[in-house]
């Protein structure tokens, strides 16, 4: 397993903190899947994702990570300013498309500009939903020193696997999907 990759250049100083109506045409053009609706009453006794709410990058409601249940989940923490994140985005986009209906993919875009994040996703035809963490809260809550980091979460909300660093290729992601979620692609 690779180690956490430190910030590659860092975030842009101008962070977007709320949905910008000027981005509506770009959001529509990118066509991200809607953000997932969470369970209204997740069982707090089950150890799993932190109870933190992030704004949806595309259309859809804000998302409380601890409430996303019901389907196996792959969470990728990324940023448009992160070269390893850019390198792995096509791998994630392809897997999300191939496994639609079997596995939910959710990106957590950290310390980024919405426009840059949307343009990156558009460039790779990545349409899986992403949420926005402008303040980098997920770093503290999930012990992340820098993106990318990928988490594998069972349908009932328990984190069963974590990969620090960029996913090198489809075959490696496929191995992780089998190991942690029992899902073949």
Regions found by a protein language model. Name each.
Residues 119-126, 134-185:
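Thiol/disulfide oxidoreductase modules built on the thioredoxin-like
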Residues 69-71, 101, 144:
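Active-site acidic short loop of glycosyltransferases
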Residues 57-59, 80, 111-113, 126, ...:
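Solvent-exposed coil/turn segments that connect beta secondary-structure elements
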Residues 32-38, 55-57, 83-86:
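Sequence contexts marking disulfide-bonded cysteines in secreted/extracellular proteins
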Residues 63-86, 92, 105:
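Short active-site neighborhood of thiol/selenol oxidoreductases, capturing the structured segment around
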Residues 86-124, 134-141:
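Structural microenvironment flanking redox-active thiols in thiol-disulfide oxidoreductases
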Residues 1-51, 185:
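N-terminal targeting signals for export/organelle localization
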Residues 41-46, 51-73:
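A short beta-strand-turn-helix
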